[in-house]
């Protein structure tokens, strides 16, 4: 989609290069930037100096009501009347100022505090999690998002992806993989 837009109009408003830099004929790498038409970014949170995963991913949606909820959750009510921020098109042109201010807001909060504050306001947000943090989250096992399999032998127990939803009375059976030649 981004490539089609770039080919058609020559720029991508949701990318950090807009409006100050020229676009080539391919979609540029976007770093921490969401590339889908919304202002999404990965922000440093409290502890980032020693924890490589002390970040939260926050999305500012384009809709006026969604942006109002986000601005109020941040305590940035001034954005609602500031012509640099009070429309989606204006925000596209001033995205670096948005990233900077939200970054200052997030830096003294843990990724879980950021997630708690913003999710209560309906702002799309999530903590950046390591594989270890994901594997230690019991709720993911409770809902079959992750399952533990005891393979036995040298492999022992390992974690894999489960089926976290119901399909017409189908209940998946989890168990060890067949040994080499064991399923022939």
Where would I find each of the regions flagged by the language model?
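Acidic, glycine-rich segments within the central catalytic cores of soluble metabolic enzymes
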Residues: 1-112, 145-155
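A generic structural signal for well-ordered coil/turn residues at beta-strand boundaries
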Residues: 37-39, 119, 160-163
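Structured core elements
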Residues: 42, 57, 126-127, 166
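A short pocket-lining beta-strand/turn micro-motif at the edge of beta-sheets
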Residues: 54-56, 121-124, 163
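Conserved PLP cofactor-binding pocket of PLP-dependent enzymes
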Residues: 119-140
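Flexible, small-/acidic-enriched active-site or ligand-binding loops
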Residues: 154-184
């Amino acid at each position: 989609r981004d490539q089609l837009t770039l080919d058609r109009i020559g720029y991508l408003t949701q990318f950090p290069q807009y409006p100050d830099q020229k676009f080539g004929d391919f979609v540029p790498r976007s770093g921490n930037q969401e590339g889908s038409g919304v202002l999404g970014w990965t922000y440093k949170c409290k502890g980032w100096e020693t924890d490589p995963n002390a970040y939260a991913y926050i999305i500012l949606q384009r809709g006026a009501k969604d942006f109002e909820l986000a601005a109020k959750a941040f305590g940035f009510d001034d954005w609602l009347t500031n012509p640099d921020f009070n429309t989606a098109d204006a925000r596209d042109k001033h995205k670096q100022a948005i990233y900077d201010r939200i970054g200052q807001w997030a830096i003294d909060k843990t990724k879980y505090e950021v997630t708690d504050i913003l999710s209560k306001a309906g702002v799309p947000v999530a903590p950046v999690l390591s594989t270890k943090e994901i594997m230690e989250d019991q709720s993911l096992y409770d809902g079959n998002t992750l399952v533990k399999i005891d393979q036995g032998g040298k492999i022992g127990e390992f974690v894999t992806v489960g089926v976290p939803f119901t399909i017409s009375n189908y209940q998946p059976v989890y168990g060890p993989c067949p040994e080499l030649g064991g399923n022939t």
